[in-house]
Amino acid sequence: MSFSTEDVLDALELAAEKPSFPCLEKLFDRFNARVPFESASKILRNAEVSDPNEKPRVPDVFWRDFLDSGTGGTCFARVAAFDALLSGLGFSTRRALGRVETDFDHAALFVEVGGREWIADVGFPLPGLVPGSGGEVETEIAALSAAETDRGVGVRFVSGVPDGPRRLEIFRATVSEEDFLALWRKTFRPDSRFLTAVSLMRRDGPRMIKFARGEVRVDDLHSRTRIPLLAERARRLSEVFGIDADVLARAFSLAGDPEPEIRDARITAYLSVDADPGKAFAAIATPDGYRRLMEGVADVAGEGWKLRFSPPGAAESGFEEEVTPDAGGRSLEIRRVYPEGREVRLAFRVEERDGATYLVREAILSGAREDLLKNDYARGRLAGTLAVDLLAWSRFL
C-alpha cells in the first residue's frame, strides 16, 4: 500500500481513531458521502489501459485519482479501496462476493469489530452497516431487513423509493485476492453497463443524489425529484458530485451524452400501504371517490371528471381540474388550471413492486428547476405537500 491514509482521512475530514464500531460507522458514512459511486473513471481507465490485467483501478490508483480529481469508482473498485483504507487503520476485514442480478456480480466487506461482524457494503452501496448475522436496520434513506441464507446474508429494502434492485445477497465465504481480481477484470467486458453510460451517485445526508441519462435524481425516504440537465452537463455535475469536469467531459465523449427523456422537472411521493393494488386504486377511481378525497382540503363543484376546487367560503378563488382515468394503468392524470391561465400536470397512481403496494402522487413542474439541486427546503416542501395527499388517500383503504 503506497497511498497515504492520512491524506485520505484529511480529504474525508476525519481523524484517525482506534478501530471501533462508531469509527467504522463514521468511515462508512463519510466514504459514501464524499467518494462517489461513478462509472466515468472506469470508462476512462478502460480506454487508456489496453492490458486486461491492468484495467482494475487498484486502491493506490483509486485513492490517487480521488485526491486529484474527486473520482470514486464502481462496485469492486470501491470495495477494494475501502478495504485498503480500513486495513490501514487497523480494522480486521475480509472480502466477500454476492449477487444483485447474477451470482458473483457483486462484492462487499465483512468487518469484525467489538467481537461482532458487520457487512460494510460500499459496492452497492447500502445506506447503512448491516449485522453479519442479519437484523433490521433503519437509516435516513431506507430501512433494510437482513436474514441469513444458505450462502450468506440476504438484504432487502423495506422502505425508500421503490426503484432499482430491492434485494441482494452477500455470500459468507471469504474470496481470495486472485478470484476477486479475476471477477473484477471481467467487469470490463465491452457490454458492461458501467462502460456504456456515465452514471454517478453519492449520499448527501438523508438524500441519495444520482445521475443517469441526462438527469439528476434526488431520492429521500418518501420521494424522488427528477431534474433534467439541459446544457453543460459536465460542469453542472462537477458542482454536484465534486468530480473534475474534464474527467466527466472525456467520459461523455467516449460513452455518449444522451439528452434527458424529460424537459420539465417532476417530484414524486410514495407511500407503502397494506392493500391490494386494485382496491387501492378503486378508492379514487370514480368521480365520487376522487371528490371524496379532495373534499378534505377544498370545496368541490362540478360534474364527472371536470371539477372546480376553492378554499372553504371563497368560491371565486381556486382552480379547475380535468381528470383522465386510466384503469389499466391504475392512474389518474390531472390537468389543473389556475385563474391566470397557468397549467400544472399532476397524477395519482398505484404501483406494485416486489409484492408491495405503493400509492404515488406526482407533480410535473415548469422548467428544468435546477435550483432544486441546491434548494432542498423548496424540494422538501413540495414533496411534503404531495405526501399529505397520499396520507389522505390511505385513510380510505
Spell out what each predicted region is:
Residues 1-29, 87-89, 149-262:
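N-terminal accessory/pre-domain segments preceding catalytic cores
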Residues 2-70:
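Secondary-structure boundary elements
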Residues 44-104:
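Extended, compositionally biased flexible segments
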Residues 80-147, 154-158:
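Hydrophobic/aromatic-rich core segments of domains that either
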Residues 97-99, 146-148, 325, 348-354:
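Short, low-complexity Ser/Thr-rich regulatory SLiMs
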Residues 260-301:
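Hydrophobic ligand-binding cavity/cleft-lining segments
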Residues 288-345, 353, 395-396:
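Glycine-rich portal/gate segments that line the openings of hydrophobic small-molecule binding cavities
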Residues 338-388, 393-395:
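Beta-strand/loop substructures that line and gate deep hydrophobic ligand-binding cavities in soluble
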